[in-house]
Amino acid sequence: MERKNVESLFAHARDINALVIGDLMLDEYLWGRAERISPEAPVQVLDVTREEVRIGGAGNVANNLVALGCRVSVASVVGGDENGTILLHAFSGKGVDVSGVFEDPQRTTSRKTRVVAANQQIVRIDRESRDPIGAGYEEKIVGFLREQGSRFNVILISDYLKGVLTPTLLAAVIAVARERKIPVVVDPKGNDYTKYRGATLLTPNRKEAEAASGIAIRDEASLCRAGERLLATADLTALVITRSEEGMSLFLRDGGVVHIPTFAREVFDVTGAGDTVLAILGLALACGVGFADAAGLANVAAGIAVGKVGTSTVSPAEVIGSMGFQHSDSDAKIKNLDGLAGIIEAEKARGKKIVFTNGCFDLLHVGHVKYLQKAKSYGDVLVLGLNSDASVRRLKGEKRPLIDEAERAHILAALDCIDYVVIFDEDTPLRLIETLKPAVLVKGGDYTPEGVVGKDVVESYGGRVELVTFVDGRSTTNIIDKILRAYGEE
C-alpha cells in the first residue's frame, strides 16, 4: 500500500464501530531484577521494582482498536469480583462501551501474573475460570448483538478457551453477522474449527493450524494443504496463518495464496501479538481494504508488537514508521512526543540503534553541525530534543532565543544527520529520555558524565553516554559578540 492509502485508512478509523467478543482478563506484570538465589530453595529471587496491571485477552484487542482510533464496544462475561470491576473501570476510562459485558457472581475473572526480569518472563501465575458460560449469558450477549448490531462495521472474536465463546454463542453471533453482512474476524483456539463455521477470516498461528488441520507443516506444500483444509472446514472467505519469523500466509476461498515475508526484528515478548494482528485485520476489512493489503499491514504491526514487552498496543504512527516510507520534506521529521514515541518503538523493532541529544541550537553554526554529525555516527537514528522558546528564556535569559522554536526546528530538520526533532518545554530533557529510552545519549564535551541529565536512566537498561568535543571558538555567544562588535555602533 502507498503511504497516502495507509494514512487514509487510519484517518477513517474514527468512523469505524468495532465489536469485540471474547474472553476478558487482566494481565499483571511484576518487573524487577533477578540477581540472587533463594536460601530456601534453588529458585531465583525477584527484587520487584515496578508493578503494572493491563487489560488482556480479548480486552487487548479492544485496546489495540482504541489505539488505532476506532470506536469500540465489548461483549463478554466477567466475574462479580474485584478483577471484574477493575476491568470495567479500565474500559470506561478508555471510552470503550461495556454495555455488552455481563457479570456472573459465580465466575472468576481471569488474572494472569507475569514475573519479568531483564525483559524476559520468569514465571506466569494464572487465576481464572474455564467453565462455559450458562445459556442465560449466551442469550444476553446475542440479545445485545441483535439490538445493537446495526451500528457495527466489524466483529472481532478473540477466543482464549476460557468459557465465554461456547459453540452455541459462536454459531448465533456468526449467523447474525452474516444476516447483516458484517465481517467476522476470529483469533481461534482449540482444534475444532467447525465452531467458527461461516466466519469471514481466521488467524491461527502455525502450531494452531497444524493441530486444527491435522497436517504437520514442514514445507510450502504441506502449508498449503493445511490452509485449504481449514478454509473448507470452517467455510471461510479467507485464512491467515501467522508463521513467526517466516511472516504470514494468506489463503483465499478462490484458491489464491499470498506469502508475506517478515522483516528482521528483535523479539522480546510474543504476548498479545495475535491481538494486534486481529485488530489491524478487523480495521482494514471494515474500511474495505483487500485481504492481501490487510494481511500486509497486520504483518508489519505484529513485528512491532513482538518488539515490546507484555500486552501492548500498536499505533498508526508505528505502523507507518515501520513501512519504510521516506520523509517527504524536513517538516515530516518534526514530531510531538506522543507521535515520536510510537515511531521510535517501530525503529527499535526494526533493529535500529537510537541516539538522543538535546540543546537550544540558537543560531546554528559549524560547531553545531559537526557535533550533530558525530552524534549520528553512534547509531542509526538521531533524535534531537529542542528546547522551546520558553525553556531557552529560562536558561539563557529574556533576550534569547534569537530564532523562534518553529524556525529552529525546521532548520535542524533540514540536516541529513537528524532523523527526528521533538520540542520540549521543560528545563531538562529527562521526560523525553525516559519515554524514548535511547541506546546512546550524547552531550557536549563541556559536561562531565556525572552531570549529564538522563545518564542514570540510560545506563539502567544498558545504554551509554558519549561526550563530544566542540569545535574551538565556535558558539552562538561568540557569533552574537562578533555581530555586536561589527554593527553595535550603527
Curated annotation (Swiss-Prot):
Subunit structure comment from the entry: Homodimer.
The keyword Nucleotide-binding appears for this protein: yes
InterPro entries: Bifunc_HldE, Carboh/pur_kinase_PfkB_CS, Cyt_trans-like, PfkB_dom, RfaE_dom_I, RfaE_dom_II, Ribokinase-like, Rossmann-like_a/b/a_fold
Region (Ribokinase): 1-330
BP-aspect Gene Ontology terms: ADP-L-glycero-beta-D-manno-heptose biosynthetic process
Protein's UniProt name: Bifunctional protein HldE
Species annotation: Geobacter metallireducens (strain ATCC 53774 / DSM 7210 / GS-15)
Pathway info: Nucleotide-sugar biosynthesis; ADP-L-glycero-beta-D-manno-heptose biosynthesis; ADP-L-glycero-beta-D-manno-heptose from D-glycero-beta-D-manno-heptose 7-phosphate: step 1/4; Nucleotide-sugar biosynthesis; ADP-L-glycero-beta-D-manno-heptose biosynthesis; ADP-L-glycero-beta-D-manno-heptose from D-glycero-beta-D-manno-heptose 7-phosphate: step 3/4
Keywords: ATP-binding, Carbohydrate metabolism, Kinase, Multifunctional enzyme, Nucleotide-binding, Nucleotidyltransferase, Transferase
